[in-house]
Regions:
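Active-site-adjacent segment of SDR/Rossmann-fold oxidoreductases
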Residues: 28, 142, 163-173
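Conserved glycine-rich cofactor-binding loop
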Residues: 14-15
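Active-site helix of classical SDR
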Residues: 117, 153
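C-terminal helical subdomain
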Residues: 177, 193-232
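Substrate-binding pocket helix/loop in short-chain dehydrogenase/reductase
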Residues: 93-94, 98-103
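The beta1-alpha1 cofactor-binding region of Rossmann-like NAD(H)/NADP(H)-dependent oxidoreductases
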Residues: 40-41, 57-67, 99
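Residue(s) in the substrate-gating loop at a strand-loop-helix junction
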Residues: 137
């Protein structure tokens, strides 16, 4: 799938990977880019830079998701591609985190994709074509030494993308799942950030967007901007006990470095 001449919606488009996606899609010749984010001020700036349109969107609110999709369909007549990219990092402890925080992270990292698909898939199916990309994380494939709510919900996002691909491929919808490792965004920047250990192998948001465009053109399901993640998947599958042992050691090192 080529982005040229496509009507595109990017959630979480105000910053980081989402912003880079909008800019790259514009460079690829997208017909119109809709930039949706709860950070409306920055969404407007991105939209202006790509000659697009901004929406204030709380992806955890299904009615808000439906309204945005309906407005785009009313204005543009179709949506060719949705980058369901909005997400949130998670608090560290699996048991210390409140039920309310667990629920909020789940709504943003998993249910938001359901809300957008529920609103947009009927029109895509009617048009006989469409594409939908869920942004998960390498943590959704490999796990992570900290931040259990993030890990659990990103695993859920991968499983949801797989389910969508199985269910809707035959109706003309190409589904993909973006699973980057370290990307130089606010999720890992800063020495006190518990994800700062990812910095040595981190790529720029622009490099991540480049990988997305390349993968979309090949219509692959799993988009891995970090090639080594594919090797890690194999290692985890070959010996899960050894993999968990390595993550326990990594967790201890991370917590020790933070004096936790």
């Amino acid at each position: 799938m080529k982005i040229k001449s496509k009507i595109v919606l990017v959630t979480g488009g105000a910053n980081g990977i989402g912003k880079a996606l909008c800019e790259r899609f514009a460079a690829e010749g997208a017909e119109k880019i809709y930039v949706a984010d709860i950070d409306f001020e920055n969404a407007e700036k991105v939209a202006e830079s790509v000659n697009g349109k901004a929406f204030r969107l709380d992806v955890s609110d299904e009615a808000n998701c439906r309204l945005v999709v309906e407005e785009i369909l009313s204005e543009a007549g179709r949506i060719d591609f949705i980058a369901s990219n909005a997400g949130i990092g998670g608090a560290e402890g699996s048991l210390e985190v409140s039920n309310e925080v667990w629920q909020k992270i789940y709504e943003i990292n998993v249910l938001s994709h359901v809300y957008l698909a529920r609103a947009a898939f009927p029109s895509m199916i009617a048009n006989g074509a469409g594409a939908f990309m869920i942004t998960s994380s390498a943590a959704g494939l490999l796990t992570h030494p900290t931040a259990a709510p993030y890990v659990v919900t990103k695993h859920g996002a991968v499983a949801l993308a797989e389910s969508f691909s199985i269910e809707f491929h035959g109706q003309g919808i190409y589904v993909s799942c973006l699973c980057p490792q370290g990307v130089k965004t606010d999720l890992i920047l800063g020495a006190e950030n518990p994800n700062s250990f990812l910095m040595p192998e981190a790529i720029s948001a622009e490099e991540c967007a480049d990988a997305v465009v390349s993968a979309l053109e090949k219509e692959v399901f799993l988009i891995l901007p970090h090639a080594e993640v594919g090797d890690y998947i194999v290692k985890k599958a070959e010996n899960r006990d050894r993999w968990l042992h390595s993550l326990r050691k990594m967790r201890a090192a991370v917590l020790n470095s933070k004096n936790i």
